[in-house]
Amino acid sequence: MDNCMSRAEYHWFFEHPVKSHCVMGNDYYFTNETMVCRNGSLTSSGEIFGYYPITHQYFSRYRLPVMHTETNCLGGVDPVGWLRKEWANVHRLKQDGVPLVGFTWYSLQDQVDWNTALRENNGHVDELGLCDLNRNIRPVGHAYKQLIQRWRDLLPTESNVLRI
């Protein structure tokens, strides 16, 4: 067994390619990019390259339709500005011929105890959602709604969008 799969299971996937049914989901957060220090330790670098060049490299390698599957921001980064920046990256990818099939802000509502990966029940709330836990829409939720309203009629008519 390698990675919980038998050799026969590996061979099945090699003999039955499913690439035509795949979408590559790329998450991107402000904390994704990391610098390796001289002593080998890691530190968050913030955004150096950004979603566009990283995702474009993945698309060039794998030639699969792409979905921006997760993004949000915490710790001093303006969520509305971040949303608009990520949307601009997605739109540029589409303009450059990358088949982009979706965009998601994660999560719909604030997250509880994600700072401990749900291992502890502390009731710690990370205010990352489009809405708070009482379903009050945050400014980033209003901005997301505005993006949808502005683009919903245009996106299906663009010649380089949603083509798989």
Locations of regions flagged by a protein language model:
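Non-catalytic scaffold segments within catalytic domains of secreted glycoside hydrolases
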Residues: 1-164
